[in-house]
Amino acid sequence: MKELDLTQGSVPKVLLQFAVPFLIANVLQALYGGADLFVVGQYDDSASVAAVAIGSQVMQTITGIILGITTGTTVLIAIATGAKDDRQVASTIGSSIWLFSIIGIVLTLVMVLFHDRISSLMHTPTEAMEDTKSYILVCSVGILFIVGYNVVCGILRGLGDSKTPLYFVGLACIINIVLDFILVGAFHLGPTGAAIATVTAQGVSFTIALWFLYRRGFHFEFTRRDIRLNRVLSKRVLTLGAPIALQDALINVSFLIITCLLYTSPSPRDKRQSR
């Protein structure tokens, strides 16, 4: 992997070299739901479009929270890397694997168990309710892929490599769009097909990212003994990542509220008919 040494060279230049790929990757990751929405809109009715719009916004909120928390891992690894403390880097990586495995399992269980309740809380239109539940349920099964991908990318960014994660998410977007057209356009699976496409793309992206990390390895010793939960490091990861996760969550929740208001407010036609 090509690691960028952020402690040397011109600060503005190095910062741009690192930040631009990171920003583009985040934008592409947010476009999963947009791709689903576009393709479903080409082949299905308005109820299906509403289901994907609601479901993708819910999943985007979850993704934002995960991305925010993994930033804590990136920051700790970057600090240890700058200090040339390879043991601290290895311990942070190992502890993060445990921490985010737990977070991923908990989020998956919560979303799978309460996907129907979440759909109801979103004031989903009756005609779109079943498709919304299906979309959220299928996407929830893939939460571990979202967590795993963001952890791997967080590790790479902490080591100074922000370009490789961009390639991973770019590939995932292409796979998602292709599968959307196949499952929604050719097989007419509607929102469920779009959700399957998204989860498959995320799974492929995570698998390739994990394979890349394994094949390329680290410039320091990292063994199975390093993969253990360190409470101090885990607390620091959460302390650093929680404010960013909260910020992303609040932004996405505001969009969720707007979505709810759109589906609870009477349309102009309904207002005219009530007069």
Please annotate each region the language model reported:
Residues F100, I155-V178, T192, I196-V199:
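Alpha-helical transmembrane segments of multi-pass membrane transporters/permeases
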Residues L31-A50, S119-T126, I182-L189, A249-P266:
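Helix-terminus/linker motif at the lipid-water interface of multi-pass membrane proteins
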Residues M1-A19, I77-L144, A186-G241:
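Short alpha-helical transmembrane segments in multi-pass integral membrane proteins
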Residues P12-L31, V58, I62, V141, ...:
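Residue-level signal for short hydrophobic patches within transmembrane helices
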Residues T61, N176-I177, F206-L210:
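Hydrophobic transmembrane alpha-helices of multi-pass small-molecule transporters
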Residues Y263-R275:
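Single conserved hydrophobic/aromatic residue that forms the stacking wall/gate
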Residues V49-L109, I146-P165, S265:
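Small-residue-rich hydrophobic transmembrane alpha-helices
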Residues F22, C139, P165, R236, ...:
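Residue-level signature of transmembrane alpha-helical cores of multipass secondary-active transporters
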